C-alpha cells in the first residue's frame, strides 16, 4: 500500500504540476483534493507544453485514473473547456481516466460575480483574488447553502436550490454591491446542459480511492497552491479559501490520515509570490528582475508577474512541521546558475531579537528582517545534468544546507521545466 502527497511548501508556483507529472509514472491514481481552477500549472513533456488548471496532472498518462475529490470546487464550464483543450492537443479524456466526486461543490455564475464585485468594493484593501468564484463557493459550502455535483444530477433538487440561491444572491448583488441581477432561467439552462455531460464522470470518489489503496495500488494526492496560501497557516488574509497543507488531504478526498505514507514538499531554489502581503526575502532590484525573467515567473492563469526573492528556509521548515513532510523536491536549480553569490534566509530579526518561526501577524511579519547565509554560486549550466554526482559542488553544498536546516531529506532535484530534467536522489 502506498499513498503519498505532493504539496507546495511556499506561496504556490513551486513546480507541483511538473513534479506530480513526474511522480505520476509511479502511481495508479492521481487525486486533486482542494482548490479549483484558480491554480494553473504547466507540464512539459518532450517538446509539448500542457497547461492544466482543474484536472489532475496524471491525465497526461494513458493508464492513470484521475480524481477530482470532494474538497475541490468545480466550475463545470471551466472543466469542459479544459477537457476540450486537452483533447485538442491529443490527450484523450473519458470516465475511465477521469472521475468527479458527487460531493464536490459547484461554482455558479453568481460566485464569480460576487468574487469580482466584493474585490472591487475592498478598494485598496483588495486581496488579489483571481475572480473565478473560488472564495464565494467555499463560503456557500460552509454556510450550508452550496450546490453539489449530486444536486445537479437531480433536476428537481437543483432547480429548488438554484432558485433560492439566485434570489438571495441577486438581493445582495443589486442592493449592497450595486451590480446587475443574474437571470435564473439562463443559469438553469446552462447547468442542465452541464448535468448531461458531467453525469458519466460522477462517482463516490472516496470509495474509489479507498479501494485502490486497499488493493495495493499507488495513489498520489496532488495539492494546489502552497503552504503559505493555506486558509489557516498562510499569510492571512492573502490566502486561498481551502486547506493546502497535508491536513486538507483526508477531508478533501475522504481517505483516513493513517493511509497516507509519505508527503513530498515542493520548493523552488528561491522564493516567489503573487499579489500583496509581506515577503521578507523579496528582491526589489536587478537581481529580482533577473530571476523573474530567467525563471519565466509569470502566472499560468493570470499572466501576472511574480515577486521574487531569496530562498526562505524558515518558510520551508514551517511547511515541514505543518504538513509532516518526509522529503523535499527542489526545483529551478537551473534558474540560479550564473549568480556569483546566492543567499538563503535562516531566521528573522524582530524587535531586537532573533526568531526562527513564521509569525501569524502580518504586521509582525512586515517588521521581520531576514538573516542570511551566503553561498558561492555556480556558473555551470545544470540543465543537462541527470545525476546528483554530476551537479556542481556549489549546488551540492546549497542542497545540503537546505536539508540540514529543515531536518528533511531532499528526494528530487529539478534542473529545467521538462519531465526528463528531473533527478531522483533519494526515497520519498
Swiss-Prot record:
Cofactor(s) needed: Mg(2+)
SUPFAM superfamilies according to UniProt: P-loop containing nucleoside triphosphate hydrolases
InterPro entries in the record: Adenylosuccin_syn_GTP-bd (IPR018220), Adenylosuccin_syn_Lys_AS (IPR033128), Adenylosuccinate_synth_dom1 (IPR042109), Adenylosuccinate_synth_dom2 (IPR042110), Adenylosuccinate_synth_dom3 (IPR042111), Adenylosuccinate_synthetase (IPR001114), P-loop_NTPase (IPR027417)
UniProt entry keywords in alphabetical sequence: Cytoplasm, GTP-binding, Ligase, Magnesium, Metal-binding, Nucleotide-binding, Purine biosynthesis
Binding site for GTP: 12-18, 40-42, 306, 332-334, 414-416
Catalytic activity, EC: 6.3.4.4
GO cellular component, one term: cytoplasm
Catalytic activity: IMP + L-aspartate + GTP = N(6)-(1,2-dicarboxyethyl)-AMP + GDP + phosphate + 2 H(+)
A GO MF term: GTP binding
Subcellular location: Cytoplasm
Family: Belongs to the adenylosuccinate synthetase family.
Protein name: Adenylosuccinate synthetase
Native source organism of the sequence: Clostridium beijerinckii (strain ATCC 51743 / NCIMB 8052)
Lineage: Bacteria, Bacillati, Bacillota, Clostridia, Eubacteriales
Amino acid at each position: 500500500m502506498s499513498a503519498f502527497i505532493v504539496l507546495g511548501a511556499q506561496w504556490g508556483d513551486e513546480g507541483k504540476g511538473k513534479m506530480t507529472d513526474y511522480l505520476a509514472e509511479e502511481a495508479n491514481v492521481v487525486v486533486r483534493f482542494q482548490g479549483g481552477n484558480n491554480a494553473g500549472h504547466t507540464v512539459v513533456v518532450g517538446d509539448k507544453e500542457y497547461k492544466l488548471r482543474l484536472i489532475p496532472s496524471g491525465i497526461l498518462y494513458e493508464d492513470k485514473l484521475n480524481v477530482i475529490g470532494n474538497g475541490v470546487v468545480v466550475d463545470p464550464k471551466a472543466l469542459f473547456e479544459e477537457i476540450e483543450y486537452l483533447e485538442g492537443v491529443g490527450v484523450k479524456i473519458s470516465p475511465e481516466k477521469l472521475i468527479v466526486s458527487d460531493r464536490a461543490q459547484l461554482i455558479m455564475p453568481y460566485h464569480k460575480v460576487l468574487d469580482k464585485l466584493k474585490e472591487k468594493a475592498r478598494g485598496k484593501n483588495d486581496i488579489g483574488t483571481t475572480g473565478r468564484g473560488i472564495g464565494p463557493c467555499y463560503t456557500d459550502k460552509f454556510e450550508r447553502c452550496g450546490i453539489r455535483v449530486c444536486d445537479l444530477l437531480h433536476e428537481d433538487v437543483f432547480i429548488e436550490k438554484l432558485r433560492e440561491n439566485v434570489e438571495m444572491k441577486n438581493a445582495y448583488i443589486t442592493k449592497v454591491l450595486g451590480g446587475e441581477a443574474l437571470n435564473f432561467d439562463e443559469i438553469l439552462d446552462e447547468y442542465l446542459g452541464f448535468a448531461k455531460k458531467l453525469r458519466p464522470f460522477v462517482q463516490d470518489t472516496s470509495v474509489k480511492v479507498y479501494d485502490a489503496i486497499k488493493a495495493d495500488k499507488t495513489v498520489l494526492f496532488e495539492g494546489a497552491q502552497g503552504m503559505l496560501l493555506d486558509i489557516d497557516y498562510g499569510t492571512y488574509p492573502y490566502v486561498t479559501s481551502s486547506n493546502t497543507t497535508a491536513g486538507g488531504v483526508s477531508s478533501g478526498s475522504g481517505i483516513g490520515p493513517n493511509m497516507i505514507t509519505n508527503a513530498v514538499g515542493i520548493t523552488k531554489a528561491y522564493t516567489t509570490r503573487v499579489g500583496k502581503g509581506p515577503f521578507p526575502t523579496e528582491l526589489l532590484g536587478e537581481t529580482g528582475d533577473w530571476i523573474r525573467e530567467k525563471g519565466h515567473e509569470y502566472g499560468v492563469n493570470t499572466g501576472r508577474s511574480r515577486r521574487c526573492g531569496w530562498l526562505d528556509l524558515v518558510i520551508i521548515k514551517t511547511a515541514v512541521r505543518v504538513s509532516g513532510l518526509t522529503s523535499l523536491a527542489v526545483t529551478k536549480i537551473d534558474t540560479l546558475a550564473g549568480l556569483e553569490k546566492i543567499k538563503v534566509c535562516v531566521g528573522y530579526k524582530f524587535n531586537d531579537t532573533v526568531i526562527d518561526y513564521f509569525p501569524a501577524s502580518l504586521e509582525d511579519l512586515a517588521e521581520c528582517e531576514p538573516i542570511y547565509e551566503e553561498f558561492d554560486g555556480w556558473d555551470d549550466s545544470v540543465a543537462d545534468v541527470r545525476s546528483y554526482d554530476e551537479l556542481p559542488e556549489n549546488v551540492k553544498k546549497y542542497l545540503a544546507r537546505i536539508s540540514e536546516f529543515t531536518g528533511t531529506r531532499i528526494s528530487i532535484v529539478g534542473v529545467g521545466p521538462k519531465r526528463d530534467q528531473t533527478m531522483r536522489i533519494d526515497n520519498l
